[in-house]
Amino acid sequence: MATAKLISQKAKAHAPSLSQATTAEKNSVLQAMAQQLKADADVLLQANQLDIANAKKNGLSDHLIDRLLLTKARIDAMATAIDHLIELPEPIGAVKEEIKRPNGLVIKEMVVPFGVVGMIYEARPNVTVDACTLAVKTGNAVVLRGSASALHSNKAIVHTLKKAFQNSPIHPDVIQLLEDTSKEEAANMMQLKSTIDVLIPRGGANLIQTVLQEATIPVIETGVGNCHVYVASSADPDMAFDIVVNAKTQRPSVCNACETLLVEQSFAKAHLPALVERLSAKGVSLVGNEGACTLDPRIAQANEDDWSTEYLDLRLAIRVVADTNEAIAHINQYGTKHSEAIITESLAERDTFFATVDAACVYHNASTRFTDGFEFGFGAEIGISTQKLHARGPMGLKALTTSKYGIYGEGQVKE
């Protein structure tokens, strides 16, 4: 079985065939990828069923199985996302800034690929497609290390995507999958600074912390999503109910789902029981602080851990707060800097919330479920960054590029 060192060397060796490719050549490969995913759908579903069977046998939770599952509709959605990606402007080669110096030198800041991007991620075979297609569009080779639970799916997907290079000058080895899913080989991959330019972990808190602690390669941190919705006193009740129910139940197993609901006390007294009725009808189990529990007996007492837990399930923590300042303080204490929403008719409250909540994405009168590269018009995403350097929020094409300075002279020398 090939090692991380060997496959990263292959990726780096063939990266120039991609970084020097034309827009038409890259888009042609992407178009072939979309078509091949649809053509190989049955093969992909069969491979995925092996992973699903193993997941059930190994006792994986329902939310992890949902993340692992491929369906015909999900494969079609992947192909559609590639079609949108093709339509996006070419991200490489643009001049971000041009400066002419008094000595006649012209300095241009140009957008270029990283070179080789490494991905370490859990479950979610769709990430394999997103990573490969975004890498092709941005001219980056990619080294993938998925989880053992998705190995059959990932191998089948990579095999399918590599067929798209058949009639292309771009070498198929710009895509590499590490099939050895041992922790030891993952640790080896994190040390390959000479062949991998940037490393992006995508998964649970333990995975991300392990990568941050062990990697010598520069890391773009993607965070877990302990997301909040705060309902202020002036919120429209119908709007608030719709947003909260959507943010929690539309797909509870993903990182942009709401995990804690904060409700201003006067709104809670008037409307919390009706909101609990809506949530309970969707199968959501509820825990809360004393202020919430006294308003509805269906809310069980929360413990301290509930406020910092990413449930990824039909479970919601509810806290009744005195005002917007208390809600903001709670979010900044327990949040993961991912996605936070306020429901209010007060523009002053909105502006305060936006200015003081520390998160990659802040929402006014909308569900947190929109934190997604496709929803933002990025075509796809390689992750959602919760750090502040290089990239923040959904990472699309721009996040997979860096700068190079071209200096144009006519014989100038330094005096």
Curated annotation (Swiss-Prot):
Subcellular location: Cytoplasm
SUPFAM superfamilies: ALDH-like
GO terms, molecular function: glutamate-5-semialdehyde dehydrogenase activity; NADP binding
EC number: 1.2.1.41
Enzyme class name: oxidoreductase
Listed PROSITE patterns: PROA
Function field: Catalyzes the NADPH-dependent reduction of L-glutamate 5-phosphate into L-glutamate 5-semialdehyde and phosphate. The product spontaneously undergoes cyclization to form 1-pyrroline-5-carboxylate.
Name of the featured protein: Gamma-glutamyl phosphate reductase
Organism: Shouchella clausii (strain KSM-K16) (Alkalihalobacillus clausii)
